[in-house]
């Protein structure tokens, strides 16, 4: 799961379909990134895979955006919070990689999508927002969904579940920080710092985790593709907000669950059981309740 940049002003109705399609493509690329991560973690340790993702992402931004936006990439109003936000995302990336190494793609993605529900809890204490009855209903519903997916007898790895929950908590904190910074920071700056801090953190750790083997040509292509999927996915989702309002795009993020299910079936021959699918639907419903609560609060 990934956090899009701050939404742009409300779009014209004629452009909503374009925004919808851009968001759908971005979410597909996020699912492709997770699929590639899962495949590579079967052959390399997780820190190495995550490091390569951030290195490719950072290089792409430097090559494509730095010549035109050099000052905008690095200039911030609240540098400490920007770096903290990026560091939290590196934790989420590590946790999701460890979870994908141990669990099927769809189930990992579903548990990670508990993040929007957790935001309701974080926002209450950090942003002073009222949770309310609908918010608490969403929180409880989301945890019921996780319990159905991770129930005894599900066959899922216990540590994989722990790491997926850790990723959800980190993602929620990351998104709350994004909201705190939205009023003062440019989307392109926040995106660059996530790539830069991830590259620094995992790049420095890489000598301790690097495995003494040379990647094959297909693996090199996958490493490059993984970073490209993430960077391009963020770009398309950010672009979608120019054409469609947040009220349309926010519920759409759950389309990534569908993409994850399809790719998990096509690539890894893995399909969730009936209880797992039920849990995924319930988690999606909890997130939609949060979106509804947010919309009602604005009116």
Predicted regions and their residues:
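C-terminal transmembrane-helix exit sites in multi-pass transporters
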Residues: 96-98, 115-137, 258-277
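Loop-to-transmembrane-helix transition segments
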Residues: 18-24, 65, 70-95, 159-167, ...
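Helix-helix packing/entry segments at the starts of transmembrane helices
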Residues: 109-114, 181-197, 234-265
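Transmembrane alpha-helical segments that form core, pore/gating elements
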Residues: 46-47, 61, 155-210, 215, ...
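Hydrophobic transmembrane alpha-helices of multi-pass small-molecule transport proteins
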Residues: 134-150, 275-294
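Hydrophobic/small/kink-forming positions within alpha-helical transmembrane segments
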Residues: 27-32, 62, 86-94, 116-121, ...
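Transmembrane alpha-helices of multi-pass small-molecule transport proteins
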Residues: 2-4, 19, 43-91, 170-173, ...
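Glycine-/small-residue-enriched transmembrane alpha-helix faces in small-molecule transporters
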Residues: 2-48, 154-180
């Amino acid at each position: 799961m990934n956090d899009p940049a701050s939404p742009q002003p409300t779009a014209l109705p004629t452009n909503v379909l374009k925004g919808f399609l851009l968001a759908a493509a971005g979410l597909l690329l996020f699912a492709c990134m997770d699929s590639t991560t899962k495949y590579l973690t079967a052959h390399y340790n997780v820190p190495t895979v995550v490091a390569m993702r951030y290195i490719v992402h950072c290089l792409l931004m430097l090559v494509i955006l730095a010549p035109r936006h050099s000052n905008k990439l690095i200039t911030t109003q609240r540098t400490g919070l920007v770096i903290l936000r990026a560091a939290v995302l590196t934790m989420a990336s590590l946790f999701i990689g460890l979870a994908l190494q141990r669990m099927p793609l769809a189930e990992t993605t579903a548990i990670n999508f508990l993040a929007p529900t957790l935001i309701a809890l974080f926002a209450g204490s950090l942003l002073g927002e009222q949770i309310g009855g609908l918010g608490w209903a969403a929180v409880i519903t989301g945890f019921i969904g996780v319990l159905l997916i991770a129930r005894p007898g599900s066959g899922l790895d216990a540590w994989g579940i722990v790491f997926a929950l850790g990723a959800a908590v980190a993602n929620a904190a990351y998104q709350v920080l994004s909201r705190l910074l939205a009023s003062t920071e440019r989307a392109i700056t926040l995106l660059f710092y996530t790539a830069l801090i991830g590259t620094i953190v995992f790049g420095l750790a890489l000598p301790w985790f690097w495995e003494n083997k040379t990647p094959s040509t297909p693996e090199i292509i996958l490493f490059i593709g993984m970073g490209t999927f993430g960077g391009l996915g963020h770009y398309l989702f950010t672009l979608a907000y120019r054409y469609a309002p947040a009220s349309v795009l926010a519920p759409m993020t759950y389309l990534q669950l569908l993409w994850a299910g399809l790719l998990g079936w096509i690539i890894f021959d893995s399909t969730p059981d009936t209880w797992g699918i039920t849990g995924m639907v319930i988690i999606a419903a909890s997130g939609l309740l949060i979106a509804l609560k947010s919309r009602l609060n604005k009116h």
